[in-house]
Amino acid sequence: MIHFADLGAISLANSNTVIAGCIVFALYYLFQFLNSKKLNFDAPVIGDASDLRSALINGYNQCPNTPFLLPTAAHPTIILPIKYIDEIKSLPPDKISFLEEFRDRYFGHYTAFANNTEGDAVTTSVKVDLTQSIARALENMQAETELAFATELPKPKDWMSVTLYPIILRMVAKVSGRVMVGEPLCRNEKWIQISTTYTRDTFLGGRAVWARHPLFRPIYALYSPELKKVRQHYTDAAEFLRPIFNQRFKEMERDDFEKPQDMIQWMIDNSGNNAKDATFQGRCQLLISFAALHTTSGLLGNAMLDLAARPKYIEALREEIAANLPENTQITKQILTKLRKMDSFLKESQRMNPLNLVTMNRKMMDTVQLSDGTILPKGSFLGMAAGSIGFDPRIFENPDEFDGFRFEKLRQQEGAENKFQLVTTGKDSLAFGHGTHSCPGRFFASNEIKTMLIELLRNYDFQLLPGTERPKNLKSDMSLVVDPTAQIQIKERCR
């Protein structure tokens, strides 16, 4: 029998344990804070955090061959000139890390964002399995695209104004989801809500933590309303995926089981001991959503706005589609490869509207001396001014002019047949990064966007609102985003 005195002793012991734990917790982060050092790197700081695009343009022009510091919110970022690209992409992971930069930028140790095991499983599944299976996935992508347009984008007889980005985001979520989680989950309203808002909530959660003094961030993170939303997304994603994975494991026990070529199976194969962990699988799917949905929607949204602002390109792209893809024909990878004008238009739209102003983002895991003596300190963050490269007159002729078929014409040069494509990376094209950690999903995204653009051009007329110019993109830290309130007019295509 337990007496009240015993309960008091237990309560006191528990209180002492909690107090001791809090002291250890506070001392640990005090030690971390006191041992943090300012970046020891001799380079000019260009601009301020309120307008990073202008800072990058000015820094790129003022320091064409030397590094400069960009005053990004969480920590300064070393912006390296393009001459270092081969050295940077060749550094081993014990010296430099893409994933650690990614995690730090979004305060992953508080948001549980992109842990190493999750990042590895997702990267392998997307870079290897998904890329090799795009041809097989196109049938499902086309079917879901047709259904998404039918349910999300009206087809009125007369001009109708619509707010573009939210519609595109939902359609991309459905089409991507058809490949990532299958049907019917890809059309589940709660799943669409989770996958489309996770990115925003992770960003806001990281920002909210950053706004606090470093000593109080761990405590704030425990009670942050922003991070509570992120944790709820993880819980909800796990609940949705648990029965799907359990069913797959039951099927795998059958003697006649044949592995489906889908993301569920690839994640099982690439997750090691975490294969049956629904929470892990939920985090992985949300990481895919983070990397894919808004970037794909941004590229497609910008292309639609550019087409609406420059209607002369619409008919040219329709003619190219008609010449290579008869009505009621299954889209194939080979057919999409033939749409060179569409590919060029998308790449030019991407050049003029860079979603990521800085790419090749890395964190130095060790101090490295480059070939010219430049020292990159351990713990520093670096990147390259991808958005500014696209406007460099030394690289592109008349860079401030929109030429939708710029890259199609460049591909007509001898030996350039397979260069200058949307998915191509290199010193003059860093939108998707470059090297080992270039965007692994860019091949899938390219095919997805083209499939959706075909559906749009075949069945809709669209234009800017009368008397308006192309809506400007909005600045957001090191990104440019499509204005979520931007509107266009649409109607059923007149044939």
UniProtKB/Swiss-Prot annotation:
Keywords: Glycoprotein, Heme, Iron, Membrane, Metal-binding, Monooxygenase, Oxidoreductase, Transmembrane, Transmembrane helix, Virulence. Its main location: membrane. One of its GO terms (biological process) is secondary metabolic process. It is found in: Membrane. Pathway: Polyketide biosynthesis. The chain crosses the membrane at residues 12-31. Its EC number is 1.-.-.-. Pfam families: p450. It comes from the Eukaryota. PROSITE patterns: CYTOCHROME_P450 (PS00086). GO terms for molecular function: heme binding; iron ion binding; monooxygenase activity; oxidoreductase activity, acting on paired donors, with incorporation or reduction of molecular oxygen. Glycans are attached at residue 115. Induction: Expression of the botcinic acid clusters genes BOA1-13 and BOA17 is coregulated by BCG1 during both in vitro and in planta growth. Its cofactor is heme. Heme binds at residue 439. The keyword Transmembrane applies. It is a single-pass membrane protein. The keyword Zinc-finger does not apply. GO terms for cellular component: membrane. Cytochrome P450 monooxygenase; part of the gene cluster A that mediates the biosynthesis of botcinic acid and its botcinin derivatives, acetate-derived polyketides that contribute to virulence when combined with the sesquiterpene botrydial. Botcinic acid and its derivatives have been shown to induce chlorosis and necrosis during host plant infection, but also have antifungal activities. Two polyketide synthases, BOA6 and BOA9, are involved in the biosynthesis of botcinins. Belongs to the cytochrome P450 family. This is Cytochrome P450 monooxygenase BOA4. It comes from Botryotinia fuckeliana (strain B05.10) (Noble rot fungus).
